[in-house]
Structures are given as C-alpha cells and as structure tokens.
C-alpha cells in the first residue's frame, strides 16, 4: 500500500482504528539505515513488519564464529543463512558481523595453542568469506581489539587470548580476508569509538596506523552505545567522522542504542546528532540500530534504548529521525525524487536536483535549480541558475547565469556571466565577463575581462583574465597577445601589465611588469632578487638575496627569489633575463627584482629563496652554499652548508652542517650536525648530532643523539639517545634510551621520565615512570611504576609465524582485577565476565557488572 508515493505500515488491533507510519528507508537517500535482527523472532509478524522500516540487516550473533563453528572444523552456516535469506526476502542489504572477536567464543578456539589458533583464524575467515562470496558485501573483520584503558595517547591492545597468543592477529585477519575476497569491504568495529571517552582517539590512532602500514582496511564501525546523559556532542562526532573520511575510510554507525536515563530530550538529541553527523560526511554510508524493539535490546527493556517499543510500534524518537531524513538525506545514487506537481526530474548518481512546479529539469552530477517557465540542463559538476525566458546549458564544472534575452553556453569548468545584448562563450575552466557591445572569447582555464570596444583573445593556459592560464587587462587602444602558460596577467602563465608606449613580451609561466621605455624578456623559471653591486647566480627552484659584495650560489630545489620560478621587476635602464621556472612576476613562475645597474640571471626551477628547497641570506663577507631542501642563514664570518630539507642558522665563528629535514642552530664555538628531519640546538661547548625526524636540544657540556622521530632534551652532563617516535627528557646524570614506537616521552609508544641516576627503557605502547636509582621496563600497553632499587631482567620473546617477529623487552606487565572502581577494572561497556573469560571481573566507578548470557557479562 502506498500513501503519497511512500510506503506505510498499518497496525491493526482488536479495534477498527489503525496507526500508519512512514518508513525510514523510503527517505534515506543514499544512506543504508539498518537494524540488528534475531532469527528467533522472525515468526512474530509485528517484529518483521517493524524491520521493514530498514534497508539493511545485521545478525546479532549467528554470523559470529561461535554461531558458525561451535566445534573445531565443523562449519554450520544455517543460522547466518536464515538471517541473510530473511534480509533478501525483505529487500534488505546484509552486513556481516563479525569474523574475529575475543569474546563469545567456543572453548576449543579460546584454549587453542598459538599455532592452532593462528591456523584457525585463517581457516575460519577463508571458509566464511568463500561461503558468502558475492552475497555479503561488507564484513566486520575484527571486533573490539583496543583496550578500554587506552587514553588517546597512542593505543593499547586488549590483552585477550588472541593478542597473547597471536600478537599480529589483526594484521593476519585483514590480510587473509583481502586475499580470499578482494571485492569485500573490510571493517574494524569497536565500542567507545564515538568520542565520549579517550578510547575513541586511541581507536582512531590504531586505524590510522593500519592505513599507514598498508593493512587492507576499507572502513571503521563506530558501535555508538551511549546514554541520554553520556553522549558526544554533534561537533565531536562530526569532527571524528570527518577525520576518518580524510583517511580514505568508509564509516558505519553499527550498533546504535541510547539509554533513556529518564531524559527523552537527551535521548532524542543523541540519536539526532549521530544521524546528522553521518549525513554531513559523505564517507558515512550506513546507520544501524542494535535491535528492533526495546524488549530485544541487550541492555534490557527498562533502558528503552531503541526506536520501537515492546509492541513494535514506533516511538517519538523514530519520528525525529524520520523528519531528519525527509529534510536532510543525501540523494540516492540511482534514483530520483520528484516533488508534487507538474515537475519532471531525472537525476543521475550524486546529483542534486530541485524542480519547482511547471518546470523540467535534467541534471547530471551537479546541481540545478530552475524557476517556473524555464528549462535547465546541467551536465556533471555544473551549476545552473536561469531566470524566466532564458535558456542555459552548462557542461560539467561550469557555472552559468543568464539574464533575460541573453544566451549563454558554458563548457566544463568555465564561468560565464552575460549582460543584456552581450554574447559570451566560455570554454572549460575559463571565466568570461562581457559588457554591452564587447566581445569576449575565452579558451579553457583563462579569465577574460574586456572593456567596451576592446578585443581580447586568450589561448589555453593557467589562471588569466585574458587568456587561459594567463591574466590580461587591456586598456582601450592597447593590444595584448598572450601565449599559454602559468600565472600571468598578460600571457599564459605570466602576468603582464603594459602602459601606453611600453612593450612587454612574456613567455609561459613567468610574470613581467614593465614601465614605459623599459624592456623585459622573461623565460619560464624561478625567482630572483638582486641588490645593486651583488652577484647572484641561482639554479632552478632556489632563492637568493645578496647584499653588496656578497656572493650566493643556489642549487635546484625549493623557493627562490632569484632564479627561475621567480618574479622580475625592472626599472628603466635595468636589464633582467630569467630562464624558465615557477611563479614569477618577471619570468614565468619565478619572482625577480633587479635595481638599476644590477644583473640577474635565473635558471629554471621551483620556488626558493637561495637554492632549491633552501633559503639563503648572506651579509657582506659571508659565504653561503645551500643544497636543495635546506635553509641557511649566515652572518658575517660564519659558514653554513645545508643539505636538502635541513634548516641551519649559524652565528659568527660557529660551524653548522645540516642534513635534509634537520634544523640546527649553533652559537659561537659550538658544533652541530643534524641529519634529515631532526632539530638540534647547541650552546657553546656542546655537541649535538640528530638523525632524521628527531629533535634535540643540548645545553653546554651535554651530548645528545636523536634518531628519526624522537625528541630529546638533555641538561649539562646528561646523555640522551632517542629512537624514532619516542620522546625523552633526561635530567643531569641520567641516561635514557628509547626504542621506536608509539606516543611516548622516552621510547615510541611508551612514556618515560627519569630523574638523576635513574635508568629507563621502554618498548612501544608501554608507560613507565622511574624514580632515581630505579629501573623499569614496560611491554606495549602496560603500566608500571618502580621505586628506587627495583630492577627487571631482560626477556626475549620470539614468535614464529608466516613472518618471524622478535621482540626484546625488559619485563612483562601484569593485568588483573583490583578493588571495585580501580584503574585495572573494566571500563564502562567493557566485558567483565562469561564462560572462559580471564579478564577483570570488576567495573570502574559508575558502572556495574551485569550478566548478559553465559558467555558474556558487561559493565553497564
């Protein structure tokens, strides 16, 4: 039965009256709006009717390993198949949940030895994905692998039997799934991921790391179990989803429920914020609630956490979500929605089309708005606004606005505005504005503005007012011809402004400004600025500024005021020749300024002040040579050599050598050598060597060596060595060594602060604090505090798998319960019991351990 083109559900009781409601799926647009189902309730017609409001289904339990393989090697897909078949019967897409999880597992799986467990993970993923190949498009591959006590600084892995026996089980699971089913979307799914707790940031860090290491992950599932009085703000969840989008990941809200907690407005706000944030981010493709009616919720009926009541009738919060979808849903990718009246609308994927009565609108991807009596056809990416009586055709990327009586045709990327009586045709990427009586033709990428009686022809190119790629402004009687190129006012790529009597010819990519009587020829190139009496030779991409008597030589690379890619401004009598390059006022792409009597020659390159990638400023008597990527500033009498990417500043009498990416500042008498990425500051008498990525600051008499990514600060007499990713702070007499890893003050992933005489070594993920004289070692994710005199012996653990991983550590952290509310108790929503569970059985303050089933108890 249909009402106003939308499906409605009728509930009939013992009385004649009936309640009808619109279905969420009919207004969801391109969003999958789903529900978790339990096959045991499929015989209840009211339950099934309520499910018809959704267009996606996920099974609560029957598609988990425990529902498919209760006995080792014996696969029974009947339960999962029942859910899948019901979804197909109701026209719903089916979402797979979940392949690997530490909880709710049969004893044979949980108690297996490391090698058996590894093989079982591979076998289960392989056989399950093969069974549903071409049927289930999305699977949660790994569920809830991050520890509840993760504080947002890096992440801590949950110390489950999976991690303890197969530490790389997450990588193994995703790699196996991709190999078996290349076209299936692979998700990581977790709770407390929506931003209420710090764990959400740790989950983001963990997923980001998977992406950086090229682990084949396609999306992240935010479970979103919250309460009316404990929920993320809209800005928080919107920002979080947006950051996942920037990682190139798809986002699903997978298990949404909101405990009422006596606050109906708060519950409505939590549901609303989640849906609005999902709709606001194009990568958020699915929005699922965890259960149909309140009686079905794993939280219990008293929490009233779902969209339907115990009789499977929609609650007010259902209508709240429905109204949001009706007003804010993104358009469906392959369907069209037509408003009542005489309108016709055909919309291709990704297109927004709004047509008022009496109009016709056909829109390819893009946006089209047509007022009564008008016709508008917009190809992909184009925006068209047409007033009555006009016709407008816009190809992809073009914007066209036409006033009465005019005609405007815009090809892709072009913008065209035509006043009465004027004609304007713009090819792709060009912008054209024509006043009455003027004619303007713009080729792609160009911008053209012509005053009455003037003529302007623009060839293809960069950003230009006259010709494509170039910018040209011509006064009456002036002529301007521009060739294709970079950023220019006159010719493509170049910029030229010519006053009467002046001549200016600019080749592509350069910018030239010439005063009357002056001549300027600019070849494409860099940036050059030379003061009188100075000699400057700049190679491509470099920048050089030389005061009288100074010399500067720049190799190819970064930003340069002198060589190609620069700009040249020449006063009468001055000459400037610039070879091809980057952005420039004089030569294409470069910037060059030459005062009378000065000469400047610039070779092709990028944008640099001294040499490619480097910056050099030299006062009289100083010499400076900079290799690409580095920046060097030398005062009189000082010498400075910088390799690519390094920053070096040397005061008189100091020597400084900086490799790419490093920064070095040396005071008189000090020596400093910095490798790429590191930063080093050395006071008199101190020595500092920094490898790539590290930051090192050393006071007099101290020594500091920092490997990539590490930060080290050493006071006099202290020594500090930091490997990549770690942060180390050592007071006088202390020693600190940091291995690579996560976020840590001492070693990557760990945090270490050492007072004088103390030693601390931390492996990734661990947190360690050591007082003077004490020794402490921490494995990833563990927390340990050692008082003076304590020590641990190093232990070597070797795990042999498809790839052999060897980890050397100094101690093994412990995990276990503490008194009620303690830091090692399970966090809210965490597991606190169940058959075979060996984790903490107490809950942190504000929650209690509640029995869910024989396999699972949770802190609520």
From Swiss-Prot:
SMART domains: fCBD, Glyco_10. GO terms for biological process: xylan catabolic process. Sequence repeats lie at residues 375-382, 391-398, 415-422, 431-438, 439-446, 447-454, 455-462, 463-470, 471-478, 479-486, 487-494, 495-502, 503-510, 511-518, 519-526, 527-534, 535-542, 543-550, 551-558, 559-566, 567-574, 575-582, 583-590, 591-598, 599-606, 607-614, 615-622, 623-630, 631-638, 639-646, 647-654, 655-662, 663-670, 671-678, 679-686, 687-694, 695-702, 703-710, 711-718, 719-726, 727-734, 735-742, 743-750, 751-758, 759-766, 767-774, 775-782. Keywords: Carbohydrate metabolism, Disulfide bond, Glycoprotein, Glycosidase, Hydrolase, Polysaccharide degradation, Repeat, Secreted, Signal, Xylan degradation. The keyword NADP does not apply. Glycans are attached at residues 295, 309, 359, 374, 390, 406, 845. Residues 375-782 are annotated as: 47 X 8 AA tandem repeats of [SKN]-S-K-T-L-P-G-G. Residues 824-860 form the CBM1 domain. It catalyses: Endohydrolysis of (1->4)-beta-D-xylosidic linkages in xylans. The active site is at residues 144, 255. GO terms for cellular component: extracellular region. Pfam families: CBM_1 (PF00734), Glyco_hydro_10 (PF00331). It is found in: Secreted. Its EC number is 3.2.1.8. Residues 21-324 form the GH10 domain. GO terms for molecular function: cellulose binding; endo-1,4-beta-xylanase activity. This is Endo-1,4-beta-xylanase B. It comes from Neocallimastix patriciarum (Rumen fungus).
């Amino acid at each position: 039965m249909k009402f106003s083109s939308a499906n409605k559900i009728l509930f009939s009781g013992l009385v004649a009256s009936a309640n009808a409601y619109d279905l969420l799926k009919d207004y969801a647009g391109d969003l999958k709006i789903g529900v978790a189902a339990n096959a045991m309730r499929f015989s209840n017609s009211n339950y099934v009717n309520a499910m018809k409001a959704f267009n996606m289904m996920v099974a609560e339990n029957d598609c988990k390993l425990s529902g498919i393989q209760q006995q080792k090697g014996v696969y029974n897909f009947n339960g999962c198949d029942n859910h899948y078949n019901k979804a197909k019967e109701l026209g719903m897409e089916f979402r797979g949940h979940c392949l690997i999880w530490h909880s709710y597992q049969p004893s044979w799986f949980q108690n297996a030895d490391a090698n058996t467990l590894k093989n079982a993970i591979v076998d289960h993923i392989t056989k399950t994905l093969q069974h549903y190949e071409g049927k289930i498009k999305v699977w949660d591959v790994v569920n809830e692998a991050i520890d509840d006590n993760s504080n947002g600084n890096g992440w801590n892995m949950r110390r489950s039997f999976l991690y303890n026996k197969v530490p790389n089980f997450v990588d193994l699971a995703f790699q196996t799934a991709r190999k078996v089913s290349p076209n299936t979307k692979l998700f990581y799914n977790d709770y407390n991921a929506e931003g209420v707790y710090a764990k959400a940031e740790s989950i983001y860090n963990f997923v980001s790391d998977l992406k950086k290491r090229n682990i084949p992950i396609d999306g992240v599932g935010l479970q979103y179990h919250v309460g009316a009085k404990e929920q993320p703000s809209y800005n928080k969840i919107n920002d979080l989803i947006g950051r996942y989008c920037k990682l190139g990941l798809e986002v699903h809200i997978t298990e949404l429920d909101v405990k009422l907690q006596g606050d109906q407005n708060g519950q409505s706000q939590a549901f609303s914020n989640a849906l609005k944030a999902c709709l606001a981010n194009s990568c958020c493709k699915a929005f699922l609630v965890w259960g149909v009616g309140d009686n079905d919720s794993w939280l219990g009926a008293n929490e009233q956490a779902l969209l339907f009541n115990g009789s499977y009738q929609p609650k007010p919060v259902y209508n709240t979500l429905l109204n949001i979808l009706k007003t804010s849903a993104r358009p469906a990718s392959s369907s069209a929605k037509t408003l009542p009246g005489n309108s016709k609308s055909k919309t291709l994927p990704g297109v927004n089309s709004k047509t008022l009565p009496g109009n016709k609108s056909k829109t390819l991807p893009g946006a089209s708005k047509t007022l009564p009596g008008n016709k508008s056809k917009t190809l992909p990416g184009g925006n068209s606004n047409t007033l009555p009586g006009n016709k407008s055709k816009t190809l992809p990327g073009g914007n066209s606005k036409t006033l009465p009586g005019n005609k405007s045709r815009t090809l892709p990327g072009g913008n065209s505005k035509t006043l009465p009586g004027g004609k304007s045709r713009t090819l792709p990427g060009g912008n054209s504005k024509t006043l009455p009586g003027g004619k303007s033709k713009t080729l792609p990428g160009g911008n053209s503005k012509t005053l009455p009686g003037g003529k302007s022809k623009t060839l293809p190119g960069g950003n230009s007012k006259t010709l494509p790629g170039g910018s040209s402004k011509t006064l009456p009687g002036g002529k301007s011809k521009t060739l294709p190129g970079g950023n220019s006012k006159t010719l493509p790529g170049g910029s030229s402004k010519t006053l009467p009597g002046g001549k200016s010819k600019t080749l592509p990519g350069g910018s030239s400004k010439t005063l009357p009587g002056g001549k300027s020829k600019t070849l494409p190139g860099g940036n050059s600025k030379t003061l009188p009496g100075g000699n400057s030779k700049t190679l491509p991409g470099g920048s050089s500024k030389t005061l009288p008597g100074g010399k500067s030589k720049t190799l190819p690379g970064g930003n340069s005021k002198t060589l190609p890619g620069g700009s040249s401004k020449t006063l009468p009598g001055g000459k400037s020749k610039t070879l091809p390059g980057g952005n420039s006022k004089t030569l294409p792409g470069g910037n060059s300024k030459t005062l009378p009597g000065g000469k400047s020659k610039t070779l092709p390159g990028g944008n640099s002040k001294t040499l490619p990638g480097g910056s050099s400023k030299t006062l009289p008597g100083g010499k400076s040579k900079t290799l690409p990527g580095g920046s060097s500033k030398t005062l009189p009498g000082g010498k400075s050599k910088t390799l690519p990417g390094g920053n070096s500043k040397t005061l008189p009498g100091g020597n400084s050598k900086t490799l790419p990416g490093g920064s070095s500042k040396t005071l008189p008498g000090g020596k400093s050598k910095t490798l790429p990425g590191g930063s080093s500051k050395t006071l008199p008498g101190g020595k500092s060597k920094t490898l790539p990525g590290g930051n090192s600051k050393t006071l007099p008499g101290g020594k500091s060596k920092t490997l990539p990514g590490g930060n080290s600060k050493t006071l006099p007499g202290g020594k500090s060595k930091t490997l990549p990713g770690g942060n180390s702070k050592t007071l006088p007499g202390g020693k600190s060594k940091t291995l690579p890893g996560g976020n840590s003050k001492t070693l990557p992933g760990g945090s270490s602060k050492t007072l004088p005489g103390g030693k601390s070594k931390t492996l990734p993920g661990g947190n360690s604090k050591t007082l003077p004289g004490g020794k402490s070692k921490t494995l990833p994710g563990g927390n340990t505090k050692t008082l003076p005199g304590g020590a641990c012996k190093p232990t070597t653990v070797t795990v042999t798998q498809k790839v052999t991983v060897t980890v050397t550590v100094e101690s093994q952290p412990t995990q276990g319960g503490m008194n009620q509310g303690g830091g090692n108790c399970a966090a809210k929503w965490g597991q606190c019991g169940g058959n075979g569970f060996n984790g903490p059985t107490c809950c942190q303050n504000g929650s209690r351990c509640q029995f869910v089933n024989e396999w699972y108890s949770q802190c609520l």
